[in-house]
């Protein structure tokens, strides 16, 4: 992946650029997780790309490289409760702002994947498909995806009946069936890890 986007800003005098992206907007449960990353300018990381286009093994390998070689990196989340209160778009923005706020040094410019950048305390530029165009955003997307997948594997150990390690919380038929079975077995209780605003398609009999 080339550095054309970042290089354009470097050429105009910007010295510190971060990328940020989120993972987990679509699942029924768990947090939405954001990554933020400042990479050394021009660094080449093998196979760096949009995290969704990489195998799990390659994401894990890149996660290690990124965390070892980044100038600064961070991950943050918004909880299911925050998602239900704010909506998923606003919660995703909140998670990204939290992640960027944890970076040291603070960036002069943040490249934000997507078409929305709300309330960032520094200059922020949106980039649709940025995780496939900007190394800074691609690195952030990998940090977010790996962190969220690990969180769902941990939740799987807590709720083995839901098989979260397999579907990572996404709305599959198997997930809906497992959730219905869990609710039936627990007196109508929905686990607190769920985003209640996402359960409109949960058909109870």
Language-model regions: role of each:
Residues 1-205:
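RNase H-like, Mg2+-dependent phosphodiesterase core
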């Amino acid at each position: 992946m080339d550095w054309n986007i970042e290089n354009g800003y470097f050429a105009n005098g910007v010295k510190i650029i971060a990328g940020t992206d989120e993972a987990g907007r679509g699942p029924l449960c768990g947090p939405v997780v954001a990554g933020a990353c400042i990479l050394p300018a021009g660094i080449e990381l093998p196979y760096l790309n949009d995290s969704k286009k990489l195998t799990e093994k390659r994401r894990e390998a890149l996660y290690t490289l990124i965390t070892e070689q980044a100038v600064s990196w961070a991950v943050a989340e918004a909880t299911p409760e925050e998602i239900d209160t704010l909506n998923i778009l606003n919660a995703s923005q909140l998670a990204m702002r939290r992640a960027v706020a944890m970076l040291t040094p603070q960036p002069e410019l943040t490249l934000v994947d997507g078409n929305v950048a709300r309330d960032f305390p520094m200059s922020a530029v949106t980039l649709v498909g940025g995780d496939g165009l900007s190394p800074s955003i691609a690195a952030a997307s990998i940090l977010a995806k790996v962190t969220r997948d690990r969180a769902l594997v941990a939740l799987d150990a807590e709720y083995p009946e839901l098989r979260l390690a397999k579907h990572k919380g996404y709305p599959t038929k198997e997930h809906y069936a497992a959730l219905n079975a869990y609710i039936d077995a627990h007196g109508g209780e929905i686990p607190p890890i769920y985003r209640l605003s996402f359960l409109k398609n949960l058909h109870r009999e």
